[in-house]
Amino acid sequence: MIKDALEAVQKRMADAMAKAGRTDRVTLIAVTKNHPVSAVETVAQLGVRTVGENRVQEAKEKLLTYNGPELEWHLIGHLQMNKVRQAVPLFSLIHSVDSSKLLDEINKVAAKCGKIQDVLLQVNVAREASKSGLTVEDFPEVRDYAKTLPNVRVKGLMCMAPFFEILKRLVLFFE
C-alpha cells in the first residue's frame, strides 16, 4: 500500500515538473505523523530519505527505535518555545519559524549544539486566523533579523494558501 502510494506521488511530481519545465531537484517529504516507526522504515527502504514530523515528542520517540538508512528529519508542525531545546538536535530543517523570539531561542540552542540550524520562515499569506505564521508585512524585518544570527540559516519560506477549487485563485496568493 505504501509502495503504491509513493509511486503515484512520485509520478505526479515528475509530471508536474515536466509540465513546469523544471529540471532541478525536488525533495519528497514523507509525513509520518501518527504512523508507527515501521512506516518510517518502510518508506526508507523504498528510497525516501526525508521524513516530516508534526510533533517534537513523536519524532523523538521514533528516532529512539528507528532502524534503517540515515534520514533527514524535518519538523513540519508548529514549534513551541518550550520545545526548541528538544527540536534543534533532532531536526535538520524546521519549517515553522514564525517570530524573532523563536529565532533567538533556536540560535541559542543551536550554538550550544555546535550546529547551524536550517529553518523556513512561515508566512501566513492568506491571513487566515486558523494558521500560524508571519504577516506579509512583518516578514522582511524578521528575515533581515535572521541574517544576523550566526547559528540560524534561512533556507526559504513555508506558506500555506487556503484551499480553492479554482487553481487561478490559488495562484494569486503566491504572486
Predicted regions and their residues:
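Conserved alpha/beta-domain cores
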Residues: 1-175
